[in-house]
Amino acid sequence: QRDLLNPNSLGAPAFNIELLAQHDVHWSAGDIAEIQPENSTARIHAFLKQHQLDANTILADGQQTLVQALADKDLTAPIQTFKTADELLAQLSPLPSREYSIASIPSQQVLRLVVRQKFDAQGELGLGSGWLTAHAALGQNIALRIRNNPSFHLIDDDRPIICIGNGTGLAGLMSLLHARTRLNYTQNWLFFGERQQAHDYFYQHTIEAWQSTGMLQRLDLAFSRDQAEKVYVHHKLREQAEELKRWIEQNAVIYVCGSIQGMASDVDQALKDILGETQLEQLRQQGRYRRDVY
């Protein structure tokens, strides 16, 4: 399943991607999905045309055609002279994998990702985001593996948690909050930032339902383009400095997920200013300041 999360947004399109496992797959809240992308059909056929190759050429193993074998190969590398399709393939490396924070927990029976489209200098869709949001057909198999991410795992008790994120970083926080609500742990606080509330409030209905049922005790939203002066997540943190200190005194654990440039560094500085560098470092060493940033 593939749904646009931000119609008419000022930012690039962001999608809710839902994948169904073909066999038992286990992950924990906070884990990462490593996706093996494939080339678009158009990209493969352009490559075949450029090198005057027949898509239906059978390879030496007799199992695959050339067009099938090129699906997960890096087609951007320079090519040396070759005599056969197999000699060509020997020159091509596999496409690199792409990592995404998982937004769901196994009991939901779906592996959910939040993927924003990225574009290169030529205006072409990025490798991972293009594959997941545009090129892969609905119902097509997606190759992935789960990467254990213990440094961002959920604590196994009912201490308060403070979740801080922006944009697609909400994904990793949603998995934590889904897990907490299943356990009926209610001391949860979410800070979320995006551009405009009308267009970029990802998973609004779920978040507001948690709030109305008491599963989300506090919610602070920062929509930067909804007022003349831009407001970001770190501004909201500073506004709530005294309440934040109270939660930390109650042994709260801080989780930060999202862009390392801008949000995560600004949040880190705000936390240093509010709590002091010494206390923030103590929280880090105690496993009470956890980050999944990219």
Please tell me what each predicted stretch does.
Residues 1-294:
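FNR-like FAD-binding dehydrogenase module
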